[in-house]
Amino acid sequence: MAVDKEVQLHAQAWDHALSYIKPTALDAAVELEIPDILEDHGGPMSLSELSAATGCPREPLYRLMRFLIFHGIFTKSDDCYAQSPLSRLFTRENLGLYMLMQATPATRSPAGLSGEALKTGTPLYLKSIRGEDSWNDPAYGFHMRAFTNAMTAHSRLTAAAIVTNYPTAFDGVRSVVDVGGRHGMAIGRLVEAFPWVRGITFDLPEIVADAPPLKGVDFVGGDMFKSVPKADAVMLMWILHDWSDDKCIEILKKCKEAIPTSTGKVMIVDAIINEEGEGDEFSGARLSLDMIMMATTTQGKERSYKEWVHLLNKAGFSKHSVKNIKTIEFVIDAYP
């Protein structure tokens, strides 16, 4: 079918767009000596054993191994990790030292992964900007313009996916707040498709101050950790993956306070990492995004369905539903 072909092409495009992260993940594994450790051990190792042997904390190591197993580098059985014929070729007696040549400060990408960064929790990206907060550093105006343009383009694509694949998303909704919506490109597209909805873009005051006018959209400045404007629905598009679990719970509680108890909903538009043995065309791209979050942030990550459910329960939501919109994200509707 034509639609299926379009989805496949979209998934392939995402894979290409995120492809830079894969070799840096393999570099990080070689830096951590994972192929050699598994080879010397002579058999499978648990996550705890591998963490102790590499000096890498369990969570980043788990995420790294999940990604590399998906790509066939290592294997996993009964919650233990093992060599594959391919991973054996990355020991130091084989191509391991060649990989390390690509992982020197002169050759590695500052937006890539490294073994040392995984151990310390300080991504190379943050070191490359002198440990400062890149989002607020005026010296990185060029980067921020590129970031804003990329997020604008992405939000339009995601909004279009909602319009096409979730046409009932705003049934019974008269107003929606787009938290962290920057200049309103996503909510503008949604209001255009669902004209009975009043859109509110909510972001930091300095961001909404520069936003051009949009038909059907109001702009409100503020802090999502303090309060969120009242509306029938609150949308969080590619917001929560930037934050730790504790911060996500804070944000979700503020969003819950902003909606009607009986009829409101919070729409989380974010990736859901597939469980082992499950997946679709976008599974690889979602795992690549998780590696990029690990490479460029200290808190961000893509979450599995179980991890999302944990956050919703902790934030006090009573029920939820998940809609596949045939792109890299899903829509999770959470109800008070």
Curated annotation (Swiss-Prot):
Give me any GO biological process, just one. methylation
- The catalytic activity of this protein is classed by the Enzyme Commission as 2.1.1.-
Q: What class of enzyme is it?
A: transferase
Indicate the residues that form the catalytic site: 241
Q: Which GO terms describe its molecular function?
A: O-methyltransferase activity; protein dimerization activity
Q: Which SUPFAM superfamilies match?
A: S-adenosyl-L-methionine-dependent methyltransferases (SSF53335), Winged helix' DNA-binding domain (SSF46785)
On whether GTP-binding is a keyword of this UniProt record, the answer is no
| Pathway per the UniProt entry | Flavonoid metabolism
Q: Which UniProt keywords apply?
A: Methyltransferase, S-adenosyl-L-methionine, Transferase
Family to which this protein belongs: Belongs to the class I-like SAM-binding methyltransferase superfamily. Cation-independent O-methyltransferase family.
Q: What's this chain's function?
A: Flavonoid 6-O-methyltransferase involved in the biosynthesis of polymethoxylated flavonoids natural products such as nevadensin and salvigenin, aroma compounds which contribute to the flavor of sweet basil, and exhibit pharmacological activities such as anti-allergic, anti-oxidant, antibacterial, anti-proliferative, and anti-inflammatory effects.
Name this protein carries in UniProt: Flavonoid 6-O-methyltransferase 6
Where is the organism placed in the taxonomic lineage, from the top?
A: Eukaryota, Viridiplantae, Streptophyta, Embryophyta, Tracheophyta
